[in-house]
Regions:
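Cyclophilin-like peptidyl-prolyl cis-trans isomerases
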Residues: 2, 6-7, 11, 18-185
Length: 185
């Protein structure tokens, strides 16, 4: 009899532990949505920690430090992408969560095959910092050159609105600002 009770207790405990793990995974998945509030509307992005864990850690860490709050989209190119994440607003600034550049996490399992992909802007291999871009069209020439780490799940109309802004030398004439960025709760 004691053996049966022990076996049943083990089964129940195992089930409860597995249930807790599933709930934790679901909570983590929910928390990997980041909202970027702009002066033109909100963009929601699902991060891809399974594809680019260090890049997602960097981005989410900067989001949680309010690093992107008040930063402009400094580069907008029609039929290509919108770019932000540089606190100087020049395209030449921005540091990673760790204060230095970090390595690419390019994977052949993801590609620039559609609009709405979030990727790291860089100045060459392994020069990732804080700058990112969102594609507005498929951009296959960027495959294996920039780390893809997220995808727009809501607000692609806002991305397109930003893309359509009047620019001078790829810089919006009127400021398009990230008011704040935060994990969706």
């Amino acid at each position: 009899m004691f053996k049966k009770v022990k076996c049943l207790a083990f089964f129940i405990l195992s089930f409860v532990c597995c249930l807790g793990t599933t709930e934790a995974k679901e909570m983590k998945a929910e928390k990997s949505i980041v909202v970027i509030e702009t002066n033109l509307g909100n963009i929601e992005i699902a991060l891809m920690p399974d594809v680019a864990p260090k890049t997602c850690e960097n981005f989410l860490g900067l989001v949680n430090k309010h690093y992107y709050d008040g930063i402009i989209f400094h580069r907008v190119i029609k039929d290509f992408m919108i770019q932000g994440g540089d606190p100087t607003g020049t395209g030449a600034g921005g540091a990673s969560l760790w204060g230095k550049n970090f390595e690419d996490e390019c994977k052949s399992t993801v590609s620039f095959n559609k609009p709405g992909l979030l990727a790291m802007a860089n100045r060459g291999p392994n020069t990732n910092g804080s700058q990112f871009f969102i594609t507005t069209v498929a951009t296959p020439w960027l495959n294996m050159r920039h780390t893809i780490f997220g995808e727009v799940v809501s607000g692609m109309d806002i991305v397109k609105k930003i893309e359509g802004a009047q620019t001078k030398q790829d810089r919006p004439v009127q400021e398009i600002k990230i008011l704040k960025a935060y994990p969706k709760s």
